[in-house]
């Protein structure tokens, strides 16, 4: 019977081989994509559990199907742990992704066609903060705010002035490529000054917020959204937080039946496990290592005149580097580094002049290497290897040397043993 196929290597060797290749790639690549991380075996085990069989439309105690007593316990644990981590009164753990979480938050806060202010994509914002190719930009009237052209930092006086001109119903704070502390109290003041709601997307910094290493938006935002992977080091998924009971009801309705059907209870179980890991004191040590590694790497680039670190540094898990004095564009840099087994992404920089398919910059994040065990010494070495590869793009002998040094690092810090 099909149900007896426990060994998928024998049943489906094509998929098994592809997964094995990905395991090999992750083991022998240095992962610097800021939105990626490495989950624990416990998180993977929960996500791969028998819960994948269970349908459970609705919420704990209010399901549309029977046989949900157990998943009610699991989802309730996830909710309570999320509330404890972030000091929120209400939490919805059902969003399948951060984009789904943002979509539901918009539905709870505004109406189609309403004016919204969100961070410009090239300044560090996210597609769901009003990009024209996103549902957000197509459903709502988004007006983008940017950063100061000189400092490349948020200019709250300029944002306030723009808000008074635009009169938005909602202001969205948060970013996917902004490397400094965000003052959410300032955004609250601006929102109040123009009678707007405030939503914060803390997807990238949630783990730092949880560890007390970045100010929390929860006391200031009407709704806070996040992903559960990235710096939270959980499974891929979303989370919505609020302290407002009426908004909590609107959020729940927006998720189900609004934009989703049955929740992924196996993923919610994995979220619950990850949340328990976040509540362990060891997580704060991990989060501090993320910061230390990012700042050490950024400093290496700052000391090389051919590279420019955007906004001159970092206060979180990521930073951007303008590479156009060394290679043609960010895409070239990304592809070259892929060849030496260093994985990162091309990224637009503030007031970008190149297309988003090329970009002037690269984005470097340290959440995954910190999870793997890399410290400051290893992080500095990685930064030096990136520079070495980019400055010697046509020198195969040097690139081979970089590959060898990358392999030494990855062999010294294995991901998982006996996984496949």
UniProtKB/Swiss-Prot annotation:
* Primary location class: cytoplasm
Q: Which SUPFAM superfamilies match?
A: PLP-dependent transferases
The protein's annotated pathway: One-carbon metabolism; tetrahydrofolate interconversion; Amino-acid biosynthesis; glycine biosynthesis; glycine from L-serine: step 1/1
Its Gene Ontology biological processes? glycine biosynthetic process from serine; tetrahydrofolate interconversion
- Locate the N6-(pyridoxal phosphate)lysine modifications and list their residues: 230
- Reaction(s) the record says it catalyses: (6R)-5,10-methylene-5,6,7,8-tetrahydrofolate + glycine + H2O = (6S)-5,6,7,8-tetrahydrofolate + L-serine
Query: What are the protein's UniProt keywords?
Result: Amino-acid biosynthesis, Cytoplasm, One-carbon metabolism, Pyridoxal phosphate, Transferase
Coiled-coil blocks: none
Q: Which residues participate in (6S)-5,6,7,8-tetrahydrofolate binding? A: 121, 125-127, 355-357
Q: What does this protein do?
A: Catalyzes the reversible interconversion of serine and glycine with tetrahydrofolate (THF) serving as the one-carbon carrier. This reaction serves as the major source of one-carbon groups required for the biosynthesis of purines, thymidylate, methionine, and other important biomolecules. Also exhibits THF-independent aldolase activity toward beta-hydroxyamino acids, producing glycine and aldehydes, via a retro-aldol mechanism.
| Name of the protein described by the UniProt record | Serine hydroxymethyltransferase
Phylogenetic classification of the source organism: Bacteria, Bacillati, Bacillota, Bacilli, Lactobacillales
């Amino acid at each position: 019977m099909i149900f007896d196929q426990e060994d998928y290597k024998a049943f489906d060797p094509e998929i098994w081989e592809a997964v094995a290749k990905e395991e090999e790639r992750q083991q022998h690549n240095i992962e610097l994509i800021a939105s990626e991380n490495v989950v624990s075996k416990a998180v993977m085990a929960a996500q791969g559990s028998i819960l994948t069989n269970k349908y459970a439309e609705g919420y704990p105690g209010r399901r549309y199907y029977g046989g949900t007593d157990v998943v009610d316990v699991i989802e309730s644990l996830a909710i309570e742990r999320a509330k404890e981590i972030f000091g929120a009164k209400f939490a919805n753990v059902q969003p399948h992704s951060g984009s789904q979480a943002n979509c539901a938050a918009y539905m709870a806060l505004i109406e189609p066609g309403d004016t919204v202010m969100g961070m410009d994509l090239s300044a560090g914002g996210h597609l769901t903060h009003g990009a024209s190719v996103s549902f957000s930009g197509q459903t709502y009237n988004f007006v983008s705010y940017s950063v100061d052209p000189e400092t490349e930092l948020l200019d709250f006086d300029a944002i306030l002035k723009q808000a008074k001109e635009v009169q938005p119903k909602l202001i969205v704070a948060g970013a996917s490529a902004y490397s400094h502390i965000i003052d959410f109290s300032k955004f609250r003041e601006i929102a109040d000054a123009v009678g707007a709601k405030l939503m914060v997307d803390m997807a990238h910094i949630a783990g730092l917020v949880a560890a007390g290493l970045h100010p929390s938006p929860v006391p200031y935002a009407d709704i806070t959204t996040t992903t559960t992977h990235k710096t939270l080091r959980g499974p891929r998924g979303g989370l919505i937080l609020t302290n407002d009971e009426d908004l909590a009801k609107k959020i729940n309705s927006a998720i189900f039946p609004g934009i989703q059907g049955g929740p992924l209870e196996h993923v919610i179980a994995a979220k619950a496990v990850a949340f328990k890991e976040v509540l362990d004191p060891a997580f704060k040590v991990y989060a501090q290592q993320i910061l230390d590694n990012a700042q050490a790497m950024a400093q290496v680039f700052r000391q090389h005149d051919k590279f420019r670190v955007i906004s001159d540094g970092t206060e979180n898990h990521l930073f951007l580097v303008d590479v156009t004095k060394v290679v043609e564009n960010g895409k070239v840099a990304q592809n070259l580094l892929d060849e030496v087994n260093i994985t990162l992404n091309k990224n637009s920089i503030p007031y970008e002049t190149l297309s988003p398919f090329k970009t002037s910059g690269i984005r470097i994040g340290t959440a995954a290497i910190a999870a793997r065990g890399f410290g400051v010494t290893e992080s500095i070495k990685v930064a030096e290897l990136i520079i070495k590869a980019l400055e010697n793009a046509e020198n195969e002998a040097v690139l081979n040397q970089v590959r060898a040094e990358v392999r030494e690092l990855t062999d010294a810090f294995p991901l998982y043993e006996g996984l496949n």
